[in-house]
Amino acid sequence: MAGGKGGKGGKGGKGGKVGGAKNKKTPQSRSYKAGLQFPVGRIHRFLKGRVSAKNRVGATAAVYAAAILEYLTAEVLELAGNASKDFKVRRITPRHLLLAIRGDEELDILIKATIAGGGVIPHIHKALLGKHSTKNRSSAKTAEPR
């Protein structure tokens, strides 16, 4: 039995607790593995709840959906942060979110929701502005006195 696989001790055998703890890995979330902040497991659960009982949801579908949601959220927050800096405040309000979304052409098409407390985008139609330009007003003022 010297040098064989039988018996106790030695290297590589099936003996007791030797080497068993080394193979244990700490559990890693799917969000951590994908390098995301959004919860992949929760999104997978929501996706499974949305499809019918016959259909299945692949594991990578949840990762892909979480990545898309995280990217869009980061994009909106970056634009809203820029809007809050323009107003010289440190807190992002619903108004800043609305200005960020409506100011970006692609996000405006994507997000059609009404944001509570966001207000409206100021816009005056060209037909309502009047036909007088700055040149006409200055020449009209100089021509008036008689």
UniProtKB/Swiss-Prot annotation:
Originating gene: HTA3
Keyword tags: Acetylation, Chromosome, DNA-binding, Nucleosome core, Nucleus, Phosphoprotein
SUPFAM superfamilies named in the record: Histone-fold (SSF47113)
Subcellular location: Nucleus; Chromosome
Primary role: Variant histone H2A which replaces conventional H2A in a subset of nucleosomes, preferentially in transcriptionally active chromatin. Nucleosomes wrap and compact DNA into chromatin, limiting DNA accessibility to the cellular machineries which require DNA as a template. Histones thereby play a central role in transcription regulation, DNA repair, DNA replication and chromosomal stability. DNA accessibility is regulated via a complex set of post-translational modifications of histones, also called histone code, and nucleosome remodeling. Essential for vegetative growth.
Subunit structure: The nucleosome is a histone octamer containing two molecules each of H2A, H2B, H3 and H4 assembled in one H3-H4 heterotetramer and two H2A-H2B heterodimers. The octamer wraps approximately 147 bp of DNA. H2A or its variant HTA3 forms a heterodimer with H2B.
Protein name (database record): Histone H2A.Z
Segments forming a coiled coil: none
Chief subcellular location: nucleus
Organism: Tetrahymena thermophila (strain SB210)
